[in-house]
Amino acid sequence: MSQIGINDGASQQPAGTTLGGVAARLGKVAVLMGGASAEREVSLMSGQGVLQALISQGVDAHAFDPAERDLAELKVEGFSHCFIALHGRFGEDGTVQGALELLGIPYTGSGVMASSIAIDKVMTKRIWRSEGLPTPEWRQVDSAAATSEAFAALGSPMIVKPDREGSTIGLTKVTQIEQCGAAYALAARHDAMVLCEQFVKGDEVTIPLLGSGAGAHALPVIRIVAPDGNYDYQNKYFTDTTQYLVPANLPAGEEAHIQQLALKAYQVLGCRGWARVDVMIDARTRAPFLLEINTSPGMTPHSLVPMAAKAAGVSYPALCLEVLRHATLDYAAAGGDAQQPSTEPA
């Protein structure tokens, strides 16, 4: 399942041949970074990494912060493609994707509908459940009292988090009913919709995915070992104490099964281009449970998609170019025909 199908242009292609052709076809590229979400700081780190990687591959790439500039300027300034390195709301929730559809500028990652569904954890879980895919039990709550009721139903520990945030922002692991009020208040500061989810004790893994349709495939599974099991915002991005194990050293046959599960989770939501699926493996039964999907994954020095790609022999610059090569639109600006990614190797 971890076949790649990417040429590492940085090491395999002579200057001025295939890479030059790809860069010329892509034209002027905007790397969208920053934005107005709670994940702005991480987005800026991702965007700067992507920007420098694309430039190193000969792409005419430029930084563009939608929090500081109007998206309409993309058309005025002649940008022909966008690499979306935005995270969270107003970046990976379908809003920017919809604007780029109207502007007729192909962009990386999932389209409008898949993006808007995937950022909504409750809606995502409902779809996965309807498709027979395993995900932890949950309750959607709108008050501290409802959070306490969810705790009584789901048991301890319970995860309380905003429905439409990422990077563990606003998340609390609740072990006593007295913590429910504060946990709800923290999550509700970030979103009016709050999710209470049954905690699964076991191995935390993540599975990056690349490609679209029948060409989509999983990269190697990464197992995450955080200090005291606390994979929070700080441990994700700003410390070196979290261990990332790739190969994940899972029992025989388990990695392939989890890759297939992640691929199915990606496909039933209609995702394309790339994403990352987070999974918990029950310590007792070894059953995997889908947690959530990220349709605009981080590309920082601590990020997981570049880590999995590297384990598969793909450099960071080649990964960025491959993601950009799949930039497309739901519908063309005129005529209504869906644009397809180039079949030219990156």
UniProtKB/Swiss-Prot annotation:
Positions annotated to bind Mg(2+) 2: 292, 294
Entry-linked PROSITE patterns: ATP_GRASP (PS50975), DALA_DALA_LIGASE_1 (PS00843), DALA_DALA_LIGASE_2 (PS00844)
GO biological process: cell wall organization; peptidoglycan biosynthetic process; regulation of cell shape
Location of the protein in the cell: Cytoplasm
GO molecular function terms attached to this record: ATP binding; D-alanine-D-alanine ligase activity; metal ion binding
InterPro entries, sorted: ATP-grasp (IPR011761), ATP_grasp_subdomain_1 (IPR013815), D-Ala_lig_Van_CS (IPR000291), D_ala_D_ala (IPR005905), Dala_Dala_lig_C (IPR011095), Dala_Dala_lig_N (IPR011127), PreATP-grasp_dom_sf (IPR016185)
Comment on bound cofactor: Binds 2 magnesium or manganese ions per subunit.
Superkingdom of source: Bacteria
Enzyme Commission number(s) of this protein: 6.3.2.4
Catalytic activity: 2 D-alanine + ATP = D-alanyl-D-alanine + ADP + phosphate + H(+)
All copies of domain ATP-grasp, residue ranges: 125-325
Binding residues annotated for Mg(2+) 1, in chain numbering: 278, 292
A GO cellular component annotation in the UniProt record: cytosol
Cross-referenced Pfam families: Dala_Dala_lig_C (PF07478), Dala_Dala_lig_N (PF01820)
Ranges in coiled-coil conformation: none
Record keywords, A-Z: ATP-binding, Cell shape, Cell wall biogenesis/degradation, Cytoplasm, Ligase, Magnesium, Manganese, Metal-binding, Nucleotide-binding, Peptidoglycan synthesis
Cofactor(s) required for function per UniProt: Mg(2+); Mn(2+)
Binding-site residues, ATP: 151-206
Cystine pairings recorded for this chain: none
Pathway field: Cell wall biogenesis; peptidoglycan biosynthesis
Family according to the record: Belongs to the D-alanine--D-alanine ligase family.
Role summary: Cell wall formation.
Matching HAMAP family: Dala_Dala_lig (MF_00047)
Name under which the protein is recorded: D-alanine--D-alanine ligase
